[in-house]
Amino acid sequence: MEVTAKLRGARLSAQKARLVADLVRGKPVAEALDVLAYSPKKAAKVVKKVLQSAIANAEENNGMDIDELRVSTICVDEGMTLKRIQPRAKGRADRILKRTCHITVKVAEK
């Protein structure tokens, strides 16, 4: 049985979050939490929080054993992009794209 946790609209790009997601996909949750704790990337902190939420959901709602859990699926999709303007010289303006992503983590027993 799979248990899910989702974070929608995280303020980081999906491309950067996928680099971190690939590190923990398929690993036992204890090992995945260790990998995320020592990763210097901003996305690691966000993914770790979602993974901890999925673990808590599995334990509280379904009574699963934490030691038997593994990250079965981790999916990072693009979210809404906020468009901002950066003024430049001679009356011009550049667009700044502030990207967001949706992170879905599913944990299952081995």
Curated annotation (Swiss-Prot):
Quaternary state and interactors: Part of the 50S ribosomal subunit.
Classification via HAMAP family: Ribosomal_uL22_B (MF_01331_B)
CDD domains for the chain: Ribosomal_L22
Source species: Chromohalobacter salexigens (strain ATCC BAA-138 / DSM 3043 / CIP 106854 / NCIMB 13768 / 1H11)
Disulfide bonds: none
GO cellular component terms given for this protein: cytosolic large ribosomal subunit
Molecular function GO terms recorded: rRNA binding; structural constituent of ribosome
Keywords of this entry: Ribonucleoprotein, Ribosomal protein, RNA-binding, rRNA-binding
The name this protein goes by in its record: Large ribosomal subunit protein uL22
